[in-house]
Amino acid sequence: GADDRLACVRAALSRRTPVSIGAIGGSITAGSNYAVRSGATHLYHHKLLAALDAIHPVRNGHSLSNGGVPGTGPTYMEHCVHDHMPRRADLLLVEYAVNTDRNPASFERLLRTLLLLPHAPALVVVNAHRWRAVRPQDGRTDKCWNSKWPVDMAANATQRAAQSWGSAGQRDEINSDEDAIADLCRHYNVPLVSMRGALLGAVRSGALSIPAFMRDCKHPAGEGHTYLAQLLLHRLLSPPALTQAPPARGHPHKCR
């Protein structure tokens, strides 16, 4: 994705200027299946905030607004996003890979709304991942897994091998929402960080156990949120080498 808006955030950090962060998404961002846990420090955006406060400290700290809404997707947020984010955020984090409502057009409309905000905040799409669970009786994909699921996700090699990018030329029901989001980010030149992209190889090889960083098939544990925060921090503070990507679509952008 384009780096021009993130470059403005880096410039503000280097000047010791306070940065305002907004995060929108579903239960992963909210921190709960039923309520927003705005003080939950294990969430990826809180960990990003803590890292920025440590690396680029400012008086009173940088600010964060948790606009996550449990159990909702972009079908809701595209209509109400202005009620769930700071008035003038410098950086917006958008997390919907596991609950896009099978309606990527809603995500696209939300993305366009954010790209056209007059103050042109930097956007980063945060793709968590729904990990596959294979039913032992017939090898078909199960709806989800959790701590009571009858197969040991940490030790069962069949479960590790079932994790994939999806079949070429065939829409994968587990990955289709996530793939649609990635396609939209490429089209609009919006930066994206991906749990699947970072961890799939280690999971398939057995070097990393899914339950070591996930609470169930969709919701990260604290370690999973740490991985997402690390991906965000790297993308924010380490611009791509020799990037030639055109600016993200939206208003012409100059750092304020």
Predicted regions: what is each one?
Residues L117-H119, Y188:
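Helix C-cap/helix->beta junction micro-motif
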Residues G1-R5, V124-V126, R171-P211, Y227-P240:
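Extracellular serine-dependent O-acyl
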Residues G22, L208-C255:
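Histidine-centered active-site loop/cap adjacent to the catalytic His
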Residues G1-G67, H79-L93:
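Serine-esterase "nucleophile elbow" of acetyl-processing enzymes
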Residues R135-R196:
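Substrate-gating cap/lid alpha-helix
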Residues S27-I28, S32-V36, S63-H82, R87-A105, ...:
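Cell-envelope and extracellular/periplasmic
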Residues F107-L114, E178:
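Generic structural signal for well-ordered alpha-helices
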Residues Y44, L48-A51, V98, T113-L114, ...:
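Catalytic cores of nucleotide-enabled group-transfer and carboxylate-activating enzymes in metabolic
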